[in-house]
Amino acid sequence: MSYYFKNLKPDLNSDVEEDDGNLLESIMANKSKREIDEQESSDDELKTLSFGSLKKAETIIDEEDFKDTKPVHKKPITTTYREESFDEDDDSEDKSDEDAGFFEEDSEDETHHGQKVPKKKSKHAPIEQSSKKRVPRVRNIPGLEIPRNKRSNLYQDIRFDKSTGKALDSSIIRKRYQFLDEYREKEIDELQKLLQDRKFLSKIDQGEREEMEQRLKSMKSRLQSMKNKDLEREILKEYENDMNKNNNTRYHLKKSEKRKVVQKWKFDHMKAKQREKVMERKRKKRLGKEFKQFEFHNRR
């Protein structure tokens, strides 16, 4: 109660009652005036606010609502079991114990229904799977996985697949499909003619032209690398045949020896200018190695 109501005392005089009524009316009028003034002041404050501050207030309210509605992660219920005594004279069990045992059984059924994955006994142990689980039609068989550098290919030729059980000998495959070089050369010639045709170039964009040039370059380099491998194969075959003419047991070269034989054959069949370039390149390489071994390079 307010201060005025505390000081009021009951009296028989009517003048006192009139004064009390006037006081009440004045108090109510002052209260209504204050409320009107507060509403007007709040409206004026809202008018002066900028859109940026209103937006910030809205985002803060949204964040608080999101925090309030965030899901709470419940911890898994762990049940503990106790040994029960079956003595007839033991009457110490209460109803609370019976209820606890009842709820423990329910929780056990719930965990069984959730089908938790059994943990391994050790990290080296094999993974245990249920025999009731259906086996998928497509499975990853060890030894037949596609390497990462070949996964980007859209199509795969089943003739060269490991699942056939045959060893992939690149020389045999190259002999079988060597006739494809003619088609590759024809494609290269056609692309070169198109890139030299001015009418055709005027009809296409700059991006399409660059793409065609890149394709032509890659086709040429691929064909040249195939031919270089064929040449190296022939060189090594001739060298091994000459070496094993009078030998009862056939001798095969190591990788390092094969590389030396191929380099020697290429150097012998080079022209004079090409030899000079190769010798100059080797000389610069040797000088660079010697320069790195100087004493001032080892200082810190």
From Swiss-Prot:
Q: List keywords of the entry alphabetically.
A: Coiled coil, Nucleus, Phosphoprotein, Ribonucleoprotein, Ribosome biogenesis, rRNA processing
Matching entries from InterPro entries are given as: RRP36 (IPR009292)
Tell me the Pfam families matching this sequence: RRP36
Residues with the modification Phosphoserine, per the entry, are: S14, S41, S42
Location comes to: Nucleus, Nucleolus
Is the keyword Plastid in the record? no
Q: Which segments does the entry list as coiled coil? A: 203-248
UniProt lists compositionally biased (Acidic residues) regions at 85-109
Which residues belong to the signal peptide in this entry?
Answer: none
Q: What does this protein do?
A: Component of the 90S pre-ribosome involved in the maturation of rRNAs. Required for early cleavages of the pre-RNAs in the 40S ribosomal subunit maturation pathway.
Q: Which PANTHER family match?
A: RIBOSOMAL RNA PROCESSING PROTEIN 36 HOMOLOG
Q: How does it assemble?
A: Associates with 90S and pre-40S pre-ribosomal particles. Interacts with CKA1, CKA2, CKB1, CKB2, PWP2, UTP15, UTP17 and UTP22.
Name the family the entry cites.
Answer: Belongs to the RRP36 family.
Supply the name of the protein.
rRNA biogenesis protein RRP36
Name the species this protein comes from.
Answer: Saccharomyces cerevisiae (strain JAY291) (Baker's yeast)
